[in-house]
């Protein structure tokens, strides 16, 4: 039977009342009772004897304290998570050469072998790009669109379908149809939607989500002069940006890593370009090629001191789920023409084609040695 509330209250108060009746403990109370009985007189003493109260046993002796020791007791701690050096806290992405930074979310393996060339410029336009193109997808090319036409020719010869545009709205809406997006010297705020009078950042969002799905990005030459005010894009370039360059001059390119994109490219070949100086300098990437700075005359272009110890010109990385293959080379028209008359044109075109194919996932990407 459940006791009443009053009974519960009484039970809860009982220990407190008992404690208040004998504040000095049971043992002292028993001794007092015996003393009072003794004071009451023999057979005729006054007052009845107090009831018997049991004497509480003496407390057991406490154990001796432990002997002093020099041993420092272990301090319990939370388990420490392993630090993942593939995560870049500055750009808030997983990036580098570890394939775990790749997300196979976009079903790009079943996507047709198709790439999109994006060559819109929002700043000084390189001569190799020619006259700006009309809006839309695959507008008519002009005879001076040398870089775009050269890329179409080179990649089509590999069985790759190539589309092209300088329309930022087309890029934002169609980007997921391609295994790789090629930024062909597209520069400055090339993804700013103010170019098409929109108020939303659709192109940037589309590129970021495309990379996170496992897309491929190829940046050529002045793609390093784009989106200076968007840190995500700087990270996509490998933590690098164009700062300045010296005269357009000859130098020797050296392949520094074995990779599917450098396969069968001579370990050293002559080339002519602007040899971009970079700020910041790329990090957490796989360097593929450099320029031998001893062959550059002059080396520097004030105020940048140049990269005398190591001047990279091509590299690759996984970035935020996708693949990024990058080169600062590609300034001159003769590097893209079919007659291969330019110094180093054969080697350069082979390097670019193989870089695009690796970014598409057609060959192994950015392999570690």
Descriptions of predicted regions:
Residues 88-101, 239-326:
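Catalytic beta-strand/loop cores that center a nucleophilic Ser/Cys/Thr
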Residues 68, 72-178, 356, 364:
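Aromatic-Pro/Gly-enriched surface loop or interdomain linker
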Residues 114-119, 162-164, 179-185, 211, ...:
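Structural recognition of the beta-strand scaffold that forms the well-ordered cores
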Residues 15-28:
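Bacterial N-terminal signal peptides that target proteins for export
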Residues 33-87:
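Bacterial Sec-dependent N-terminal signal peptides
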Residues 1-15:
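Short, Lys/Arg-enriched N-terminal segments with co-localized hydrophobic residues
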Residues 187-267:
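A glycine-rich, often tryptophan-bearing local segment used as a flexible ligand/cofactor-contacting loop or short
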Residues 333-348:
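A short acidic/glycine-rich loop-to-helix N-cap element
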